[in-house]
Amino acid sequence: SDSPQAIALIFTLYAIVTVLSIFGGYLPTYFVDKLGMNPYLGRMRAMLIFACFPLLGLLAQPMGQISPWWPAIIIGLLGAGHQAWSANLYSTIGDMFPKSTIATITGIGAMAGGVGSFLINKGSGLLFTYAENKGDAFSFMGFDGKPAGYMIVFCICAVAYLIGWCIMKMLVPKYKPIVVE
């Protein structure tokens, strides 16, 4: 909608994303320069912090029943966490791989992200249609119908980054640059 409140909500959401995502790029540098951590540990600690931001998404829908400002603020924090996570994830490629492979590795990662995005969006759309058709017969965590579908998606997104961080930590438990011969 083009109402003044809707415009203010969207502005607030994007302002939060913009300001905090810039800070998200700085946090690993702070850990390295000010706390003396090695770059890998600093980046992984920052990524763990950003992976926790989406947990706030579990509150967006319930808090929306109190005021529309809460979801705007919470989703702004989620977006900032996502941006900071992504920036640091892509930076790990430059940290670990030789310059001659960075573009290829980044492209493979971006393609995987695009396919994952397509699948989550397609699955969400099917879930929303199903939930809407079932109406009150479809219930999840106190929400019925389509709102229950949205709550399911918020739950999936809330844990996806933590799962991703754990997978990355399992695949790369210690920093070791990859050498291509």
What are these regions (language model features)?
Residues 55-63, 150-181:
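Multi-pass alpha-helical transporter architecture, strongest
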Residues 12-19, 76, 107-115:
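Transmembrane alpha-helical cores of Major Facilitator Superfamily
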Residues 39-45, 126-159:
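A membrane-interface helix-boundary motif in multi-pass transporters
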Residues 4-5, 99-109:
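Loop-to-transmembrane helix entry/capping segments in MFS-fold secondary transporters
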Residues 27-28, 32, 123-133:
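Interfacial helix-cap and linker-helix signal at transmembrane-aqueous boundaries
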Residues 33-34, 93-102:
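Paired intracellular helix-loop junctions of major facilitator superfamily
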Residues 7-33, 50:
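Transmembrane alpha-helices of Major Facilitator/SLC transporters
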Residues 40-89:
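C-terminal transmembrane helical hairpin of 12-TM major facilitator-type secondary transporters
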